[in-house]
């Protein structure tokens, strides 16, 4: 079956460490607009921002992008994009849903396209990205999620686990998980219907819910890591990069 993708970008107004970060100005534009523009450059599907606040919706539409307002009480971006999908596409035209985080203003079109590639294997439920860790301090940083997987090729893994700990043990490279997901529609439907799993709650990583329910996640390895914006320090770094 041919892949018919749609890109959904979740963006909520609330953020504990950096309030209203989706609207933070970077090089003359709000952060969420930078993400939408990069997604548009990937040029393979419809792009919609899914938000919980009218202020974000107004900004997104003012820049010519499509937006939908969702409920405010979603616990994850996956839940938010699923609600958006049910409103946008009741006819089920789209069979692949690409979840591009709204706080990745330095993401590239190449990385977005790469996230789809593992779905070329019909056995893969969910595809995501990773990159080799090159900074020594990141190996022990709990904010850097590591991938434990079995190699399928030189640039692809089947994920066995994700962790904030330093793993796997021993000699060899470690890989940084990049939180972009391409779901088969049926996989997203299954995922959001599941209750949070024990390991998900312990590690605070929602992708573990899928693994604990025997869903297959394959990881495409890319060369660069887009900088996520979670703090004011992150925001200042991104402003320098995109200045």
From Swiss-Prot:
<keyword id="KW-0548">Nucleotidyltransferase</keyword>
<dbReference type="GO" id="GO:0033468">
    <property type="term" value="P:CMP-keto-3-deoxy-D-manno-octulosonic acid biosynthetic process"/>
</dbReference>
<dbReference type="GO" id="GO:0008690">
    <property type="term" value="F:3-deoxy-manno-octulosonate cytidylyltransferase activity"/>
</dbReference>
<comment type="pathway">
    <text>Nucleotide-sugar biosynthesis; CMP-3-deoxy-D-manno-octulosonate biosynthesis; CMP-3-deoxy-D-manno-octulosonate from 3-deoxy-D-manno-octulosonate and CTP: step 1/1.</text>
</comment>
<dbReference type="Pfam" id="PF02348">
    <property type="entry name" value="CTP_transf_3"/>
</dbReference>
<comment type="function">
    <text>Activates KDO (a required 8-carbon sugar) for incorporation into bacterial lipopolysaccharide in Gram-negative bacteria.</text>
</comment>
<keyword id="KW-0808">Transferase</keyword>
<comment type="pathway">
    <text>Bacterial outer membrane biogenesis; lipopolysaccharide biosynthesis.</text>
</comment>
<protein>
    <recommendedName>
        <fullName>3-deoxy-manno-octulosonate cytidylyltransferase</fullName>
        <ecNumber>2.7.7.38</ecNumber>
    </recommendedName>
</protein>
<keyword id="KW-0448">Lipopolysaccharide biosynthesis</keyword>
<dbReference type="InterPro" id="IPR004528">
    <property type="entry name" value="KdsB"/>
</dbReference>
<comment type="similarity">
    <text>Belongs to the KdsB family.</text>
</comment>
<dbReference type="InterPro" id="IPR029044">
    <property type="entry name" value="Nucleotide-diphossugar_trans"/>
</dbReference>
<dbReference type="GO" id="GO:0009103">
    <property type="term" value="P:lipopolysaccharide biosynthetic process"/>
</dbReference>
<keyword id="KW-0963">Cytoplasm</keyword>
<dbReference type="GO" id="GO:0005829">
    <property type="term" value="C:cytosol"/>
</dbReference>
<dbReference type="InterPro" id="IPR003329">
    <property type="entry name" value="Cytidylyl_trans"/>
</dbReference>
């Amino acid at each position: 079956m041919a892949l018919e993708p749609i890109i959904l970008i979740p963006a909520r107004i609330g953020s504990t460490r950096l309030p209203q970060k989706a609207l933070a100005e970077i090089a003359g534009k709000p952060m969420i607009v930078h993400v939408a523009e990069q997604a548009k450059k990937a040029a393979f599907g419809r792009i919609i921002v899914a938000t919980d606040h009218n202020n974000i919706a107004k900004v997104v539409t003012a820049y010519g992008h499509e937006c939908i307002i969702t409920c405010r009480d979603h616990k994850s971006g996956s839940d938010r994009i699923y609600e958006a999908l049910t409103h946008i596409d009741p006819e089920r035209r789209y069979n692949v849903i690409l979840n591009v985080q709204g706080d990745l203003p330095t993401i590239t079109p190449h990385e977005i396209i790469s996230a789809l590639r593992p779905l070329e294997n019909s056995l893969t439920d969910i595809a995501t990205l990773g990159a080799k860790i090159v900074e020594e301090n990141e190996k022990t940083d709990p904010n850097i999620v590591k991938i434990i997987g079995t190699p399928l090729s030189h640039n692809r893994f089947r994920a066995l686990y994700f962790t904030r700990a330093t793993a796997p043990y021993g000699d060899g490279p470690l890989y940084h998980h990049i939180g972009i997901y391409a779901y088969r529609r049926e996989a997203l439907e299954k995922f959001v219907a599941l209750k949070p799993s024990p390991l998900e709650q312990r590690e605070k990583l929602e992708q573990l819910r899928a693994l604990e329910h025997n869903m297959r996640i394959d990881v495409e390895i890319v060369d660069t890591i887009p900088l996520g914006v979670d703090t004011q320090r992150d925001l200042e770094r991104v402003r320098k990069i995109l200045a």
